[in-house]
Amino acid sequence: LYLSYGNIVILLNLSMNDLKNNFIEFAIKEKLLRFGDFTLKSGRNSPYYFNTGLCNSGSKLRSLADFYANYIHQNELNFDFIFGPAYKGITLASSISLQLDNVFSIDKPFSSNRKEEKTHGDVGTLIGSPLSGKGLIVDDVISSGSSIKESINIIKKNNAEPISILVALDRMELGKSKSATSEIESENGIKVHSIINIDDVVDYLEKKEKDSDCFLRMKKYLDEFQR
């Protein structure tokens, strides 16, 4: 379901189910989504790991941005600017902005934060467009939600409004009382969108590898930690 023009890969008019399955296959092929034994930042052991930082070439990054752009277009997300938290969000915001314009003629400014404030030249804590109006926050994955919460605060401090959040993968894991997604939505009144969530991955594995050790470990893990 890819439409190719030379080396350019564009996704057009896919159903959401097709978009999800194509994204999972892309993520596995490019090793953004890996299965094995991993230790997360939280210290929790996980049978899978997701990292869009491995989209480290023009073609891979373009393909990744196409999935975000298609999701935005299909779900008619309305916003005035795109904000990507440092560091991975910097390339995400810029590439998504580029592909929205290339594929759908939707031209939106983008911005990111600096980890440290710049005190000379282009001073301040922001890179890119000034924040004005309603913002879409883009990131690769939502686990604890810490970078998303920081982004919400940055946008509000700049007198703009965070209106929506879009991540590639929602891990849907239980925190202290509920998932990070539920916490962000209930505390801020902001909808969290994801191209896929971990249930989509498990459903995909069940169809492809129902009796595999990978599927069984994933199912056991989610039964313990998912909300």
Protein language model annotation of sequence segments:
Residues L1-V138, S146-R227:
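PRPP-associated nucleotide enzymes
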Residues S143:
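Active-site-proximal mixed secondary-structure blocks
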